[in-house]
From Swiss-Prot:
This is Histidine--tRNA ligase 2. Disulfide bonds: none annotated. GO terms for biological process: histidyl-tRNA aminoacylation. GO terms for cellular component: cytoplasm. Keywords: Aminoacyl-tRNA synthetase, ATP-binding, Cytoplasm, Ligase, Nucleotide-binding, Protein biosynthesis. It holds the Pfam family HGTP_anticodon.
Length: 425
């Protein structure tokens, strides 16, 4: 029989027990924080109609390039979800009677056929929180406070960068960029920290932006790098949409100060969050130390998505945030922050007394302990070696003598201390 050359699809990976146990812990920590903030659990399908995910209320042109598409037996065009946002918007559109404000969280696999780098894969797990029905920037402030609590609990230091798409839109209007070029220009600006100002200008030229507009953008890039929100409010010309963005940013900034998290938050006038779905506040989360340079979380306000799917003129105010389990796990591993805990509390080793060993294991499991039984009749030295390697704290030995006396032997693997525990065999 031919031996297959097994390997994972590029951009995917297996998580063996020692790794997956940490990821389970991460998910539980995030889920606990989400519930503390009043969020309710939800699950949506991984497979969706391509038209839904590719709609203008989805991720935009850049994400469409990365979608995994397929057809079913009925020749319907389908795609694997690339995030959890549009599936949430679909749920809200299909269930208009959901009481609002509505907070939900979802943890699930998503798929993007994009670049692969440290912590970035093509199949990955996202943890999303979204709030529908609140138009106040206080909703954003609460989500950002929740983010600081998430990273405090898992032991990583991070900072939050934030901006407002209305501010960017207004600046592009002032610079003279045509409306039909706004989305593409914002995508280029979103790459500024990676490619630098010179390359931003080069890409703007390549896409055919007016020369005068490019000159104004270049001047803006040079002048605004160290600007705060107050500079835009007092020292710069504004448009009505820009004034809205400034007011929302000022209200957000005030809330961040009141919540005492402003020291972890930085205004970045060039942060764009390239996805076309966003209509107001946008933010990204970055670790302050370590090798992971890309964001470990992001989000923003997308008031047009739900109403766009329902066809209603009245927007449904919605804001969300997303955390990447895989990139966070990678960061913990790279920084040596993973404190591997044992997966078992007890390891029962029968000395020719398998049925009795099962009875002891069953009793302990009913008390809430994690227990495994050795069934392969390993030599005692090999069984104890397994316990040491897996850092199992207690081993139970059951042989003829233990069954006859009605007491099993309990060994503390850290101290070596032994004791006999009564049990009715």
């Amino acid at each position: 029989m031919k031996k297959w050359d097994y390997q994972n699809v590029r951009g995917t990976q297996d998580y063996l027990p020692e790794d997956e146990s940490v990821r389970v812990w991460l998910r539980r920590e995030l889920e606990e924080v989400f519930q503390q903030y009043g969020c309710k659990p939800m699950e949506t399908p991984m497979i969706n109609y391509t038209d839904l995910l590719a709609s203008k209320y989805g991720g935009g042109a850049e994400i469409k390039k990365e979608m995994y598409t397929l057809t079913d037996r009925g020749k319907r065009a389908l795609a694997l979800r690339y995030d959890l946002t549009i599936p949430f918007a679909k749920v809200m559109a299909m269930n208009p009677d959901i009481r609002k404000p509505f907070k939900r969280y979802e943890i699930g696999k998503v798929f993007r056929d994009g670049p692969i780098k440290a912590g970035r894969f093509r199949e990955f797990t996202q943890c999303d929180v979204d709030v529908a029905g609140v138009d106040s920037p206080l909703a954003e402030a609460e989500l950002l406070e929740m983010a600081t609590e998430v990273f405090r609990r898992i032991g990583l230091n991070m900072t939050i960068q934030y901006n407002n798409r209305k501010l960017l839109t207004g600046m592009l209007d002032i610079c003279g960029v045509s409306k039909d070029q706004h989305s593409a220009v914002i995508l280029i600006l979103d790459k500024r920290e990676k490619i630098g100002d010179k390359q931003v200008v080069n890409e703007l030229k390549e896409m055919g932006v007016d020369g005068k507009a490019i000159s104004k953008i270049a001047q803006w890039l040079k002048q605004m790098s160290q600007s705060g929100i107050v500079d835009f409010a007092t020292d710069r010309p504004t448009t009505p949409i820009m004034a809205e963005g400034i007011a929302e940013l000022q209200e957000l900034e005030e809330a961040l100060r009141y919540l005492n998290i402003d020291s972890q938050c930085t205004f970045n006038p060039f942060l764009a969050r390239g996805l076309e779905i966003y209509t107001g506040t946008v933010y990204e989360l970055f670790l302050t130390e370590g090798a992971i340079q890309s964001s470990v979380g992001s989000g923003g306000r997308y008031d047009q998505a739900i109403s766009g799917l329902t066809g209603e003129e009245q927007p449904m105010p919605t804001v969300g945030i997303s955390f990447g389990i895989d990139v966070i796990y990678t960061a913990l591993k790279m920084e040596g922050r993973i404190n591997q805990k044992p997966l078992l509390d007890y390891y029962v080793i029968p000395l020719q007394k398998q049925k009795e060993a099962l009875a002891v294991a069953s009793s302990l499991r009913k008390q809430g302990f994690r227990v495994d039984v050795e069934f392969k009749n390993k030599k005692l030295t090999k069984a104890l070696d397994r316990a040491n390697k897996e850092k199992i704290p207690f081993v139970i030995l059951i042989g003829e003598e233990e069954v006859a006396s009605g007491r099993y032997k309990l060994k503390n693997m850290e101290t070596g201390a032994e004791q006999h525990v009564p049990f009715s065999f």
